[in-house]
Curated annotation (Swiss-Prot):
Organism: Bacillus subtilis
Protein name: Vegetative protein 6
Top-level lineage group: Bacteria
Amino acid sequence: LGTGLGVDQN
């Protein structure tokens, strides 16, 4: 998810 944070997960 492109949450705008540096933490994107599948």
